[in-house]
Amino acid sequence: MMIIIPNNEIAKHMLTDFFAKHWGTPEMAISSGIFRCDELDGFAAVNESGEIIGCITYTIDGKDCEIISLDSMIENKGIGTALLQQVEEKAKHAHCQRIKLITTNDNVNAIAFYQKRGYQFAAVFPNAVEKARRLKPEIPEVAENGILIRDEILFSKVID
């Protein structure tokens, strides 16, 4: 059992600890800049013990909603989908025209996940992770699956 709650209803130290545990730091570096995930709007999936088992963060800028991070600690249980649906609803209510996000070339699970949910490749930025790595040197060169972490992929979904 899980509940989805807005991040601003969770103690900030819990969010900070969650991102530090899973990303090494609450800072997310992509080529467009550095974001403090524990300070962004978002939603968390919380289990019956009160532990965060998933989290999504996003920004809204005019007609664009950008997902900055999506983490699910238990895959194939609907956590990521439930969190994504919350942001999609929020974006609709904010009259956004599209939702966009960036992932990296090594993240094959995310690439499949987003395509199954209607997101399309909008652009590929070769070697963009080098720029992000200058902002956040902790970004590894090679992923756990053995793929070089090198390119950013922009996904986009038009909101009806």
Curated annotation (Swiss-Prot):
Source domain of life is Bacteria
Domain named N-acetyltransferase: residues? 2-140
- The organism encoding this protein is Bacillus subtilis (strain 168)
Citing just one GO molecular function, the answer is: acyltransferase activity, transferring groups other than amino-acyl groups
Q: Which InterPro entries match?
A: Acyl_CoA_acyltransferase, GNAT_dom, N-term/lysine_N-AcTrnsfr
Cystine connections: none
**Pfam family membership, one:** Acetyltransf_1
What name has this protein been given in UniProt? Uncharacterized protein YdhI
